[in-house]
């Protein structure tokens, strides 16, 4: 996000606001955060609020989230977050490169415990704040699963649904995480 410098009463358009996000959130190799194009606007807004209020990004051991939380200091207000979230939600998802290898059949069995929140086809459910999984790159899904399992995400006392994720996969091995990621990527 970028803040307008100066006293201009005019807000920049949504695309211009989003441009500063692309330093990390594009498929160019820079900081290489997740590509956000096509993610649901409600989920983007929810996550932006978590970064802004400290539910995410306070642990320097989770470098990517720590950097994201620092960038949120430049966001003016909730309206700016809403505008960016709506803009992202209207972008078409980008094609992604498959990078993770695993056992798809084993992953399907593991995924059966994810269906209640993320849906049989990975479509997600807003009522339990579970995002669709189909637009995210496999390396990022695996990274986030590891962060949940290792307590680097979803542990804030106010992050109820994040804590559900932590508990759901706490005992999963790295092979489990890779296999379920490969299955999700096949949906």
Protein language model regions, located:
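N-terminal export/targeting leaders of redox proteins
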Residues: 1-12, 49, 53, 186
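Sequence/structural segment immediately N-terminal to covalent heme-attachment motifs in c-type
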Residues: 4-29, 99-123
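The feature marks the first
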Residues: 14-53
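Solvent-exposed, polar/charged alpha-helical surfaces in well-ordered, non-transmembrane soluble domains
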Residues: 15, 19, 42, 46, ...
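Disulfide-stabilized extracellular ectodomain repeats and their linkers
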Residues: 18-21, 33, 41, 65, ...
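Axial heme c-ligation environment in periplasmic c-type cytochrome domains
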Residues: 30-37, 52-82, 88-91, 96-102, ...
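A charged, solvent-exposed segment within the mature domains of Sec-exported extracytoplasmic proteins
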Residues: 105-152, 167
């Amino acid at each position: 996000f970028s803040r307008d410098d100066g006293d201009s009463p005019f807000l920049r358009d949504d695309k211009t606001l989003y441009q500063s996000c692309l330093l990390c959130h594009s498929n160019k190799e820079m900081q290489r955060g997740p590509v956000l194009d096509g993610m649901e606007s409600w989920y983007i807004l929810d996550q932006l609020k978590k970064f802004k209020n400290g539910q995410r990004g306070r642990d320097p051991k989770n470098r990517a989230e720590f950097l994201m939380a620092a960038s949120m200091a430049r966001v003016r207000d909730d309206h700016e977050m809403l505008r960016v979230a709506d803009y992202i939600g209207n972008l078409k998802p980008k094609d992604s490169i498959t990078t993770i290898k695993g056992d798809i059949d084993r992953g399907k069995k593991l995924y059966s415990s994810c269906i209640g929140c993320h849906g049989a086809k990975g479509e997600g459910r807003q009522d339990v704040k579970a995002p669709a999984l189909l637009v995210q790159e496999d390396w990022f899904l695996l990274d986030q699963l590891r962060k949940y399992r290792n307590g680097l995400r979803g542990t804030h006392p106010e992050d109820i649904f994040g804590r559900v994720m932590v508990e759901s996969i706490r005992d999963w091995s790295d092979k489990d995480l890779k296999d379920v990621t490969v299955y999700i990527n096949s949906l």
